[in-house]
Amino acid sequence: MLKVAVMFGGKSVEHEVSIITGLQVIENMNKEKYEPIPVYVGRDGRWYTGKGLLDISNYKDIPSLLKKCEQVVLPPVPGLNKLYYYPFRKKFMSKEYDYIDVDVIFPAFHGTHGEDGTMQGLFQLANIPYVGSGVVGSATGMDKVIMKDIFKANNLPIVNYLWFLRKEYEKNKEAMLDLIESKLKYPMFVKPANLGSSIGISKAKNRDELFDAIEIAIYYDRKIIVEEAVKDPMEVNCSVMGIDRDLEISLCEMPVPWEEFLSYQDKYMRKEKGGKGSTTRQIPAPIPEEKTKEIQELAKKVFQILDCSGLARIDFLLEKETMKVYVNEINTIPGSFAFYLWKPLGISFEKLIDRLIEYAVERHKEYARNMYTFETTLLLKAADRGTKM
């Protein structure tokens, strides 16, 4: 039986959504094949484990919950595959420090310090198999500026955009507004570069609204991206699963919007019959078959270009009048792991989790084939000559 550390929470404005996703993963995991270990990461970055983390009702009072849990840490030491209790303590009648064995890590983070490559780097250093994209795919999938630059370099259809730094804007706000207006047409969307769930995003139809939108966005990030809005858009999403070039494509969905664009409240706070508070969606998306195929092929290409792994959801915009498709963004750890896009294909949430863990183990074996040493006499020569080369 594999011991799977399911990690959630984190230093992110999407903290609460991550808790829900993490508990959904644990709830739907096959307990005959896996032993789930809940690992909650607090807003301060500290890691906790304990049975109390399994009950969603306990999160109404997190300080009280954490008093019943124990802190753990993951040393970045290859081969340990252990979470150590912290402060470090020795096992009873032993000189060895107490720990929890871990075979696979299943990150269920959303947003910064979890979905952006930071945690993935730690898992990589510790040499533990982990679910989802690696450092590169996670980092590029989180930063909207780098993501859009890569899309543009690969001739993918995207809207016009520009980006700037918070300190550049604060140095001369009017000049930055002038620059944006000279490059882009209203209406526009202003977004923090490194957030998801529509947090910090605003639509601007004129200069005053543009100013207000930027003032909101700079509260969340040092880097801001501004995009031209698609006229009368329809949002369509598609999920991709697999590793390398062995990929599967899900059905497409069309979220039914409550407002002009899906806000955080729309996505997570409005209750849907039979759900845990989510967006109303149409599956499959009611669009022509050729557009469905076009979106599925683009989704696959995005997944490969960013070197993603495991599972991701790619979001698109369709201009209603022309039916032109635009790639919007990728979510390398989508909410609920987009299980609802795979269920109509006969892949239950439980089977989806199985696949993702299998991919994690397979990719880890592939990484193990890489050579990280190279025999050379360089240091011997340096010792003879001193530090000068």
From Swiss-Prot:
It comes from the Bacteria. Coiled coil: none annotated. The gene is ddl. This is D-alanine--D-alanine ligase. Its cofactor is Mg(2+); Mn(2+). Belongs to the D-alanine--D-alanine ligase family. One of its GO terms (biological process) is cell wall organization. Mg(2+) 2 binds at E329, N331. Binds 2 magnesium or manganese ions per subunit. Mg(2+) 1 binds at D315, E329. It catalyses: 2 D-alanine + ATP = D-alanyl-D-alanine + ADP + phosphate + H(+). Keywords: ATP-binding, Cell shape, Cell wall biogenesis/degradation, Cytoplasm, Ligase, Magnesium, Manganese, Metal-binding, Nucleotide-binding, Peptidoglycan synthesis. It is found in: Cytoplasm. GO terms for molecular function: ATP binding; D-alanine-D-alanine ligase activity; metal ion binding. Cell wall formation. InterPro entries: ATP-grasp (IPR011761), ATP_grasp_subdomain_1 (IPR013815), D-Ala_lig_Van_CS (IPR000291), D_ala_D_ala (IPR005905), Dala_Dala_lig_C (IPR011095), Dala_Dala_lig_N (IPR011127), PreATP-grasp_dom_sf (IPR016185). Pathway: Cell wall biogenesis; peptidoglycan biosynthesis. The keyword Electron transport does not apply. It comes from Caldanaerobacter subterraneus subsp. tengcongensis (strain DSM 15242 / JCM 11007 / NBRC 100824 / MB4) (Thermoanaerobacter tengcongensis). Its EC number is 6.3.2.4. GO terms for cellular component: cytosol. Residues 148-358 form the ATP-grasp domain. ATP binds at residues 181-236.
